[in-house]
């Protein structure tokens, strides 16, 4: 992935992380499907958090003049899909994510690691390292 693409994806990822989405995975779908170039998959701990994450994503991206083509699933809050054309964001309640297992379904997709995700991983690792002391 190019630096331009990474910075664009970091905009989406930053929006996803704004309401503490968990288990964020970015899949390179370009070679596997014509639906989208990238899937961003994340989880929330409750249907209320799932909806808050989805709403926050829309607010943040709208400030950058990026609007979804379609939004589905907000009524139930179990699986919200935000279609931004080349990027599709799946926000799951964790039990639904486990059930549908998109991560496993698209196991052949490459994982994309952007600067924002690298920073997130480092922050998640830091408390674990302190626990070892």
Regions found by a protein language model. Give the residues of each.
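Glycine/charge-rich, flexible interdomain linkers and switch-proximal surface loops
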Residues: 23, 27-33, 69-86
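Compact, glycine-rich, soluble single-domain proteins
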Residues: 49-66, 81
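Short linear Ser/Thr-Pro motifs
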Residues: 33-34, 46
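Long, contiguous binding/interaction regions
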Residues: 1-26, 30, 48, 52, ...
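Short hydrophobic/aromatic beta-strand micro-patches
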Residues: 41-43
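Short amphipathic alpha-helical segments
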Residues: 36-38
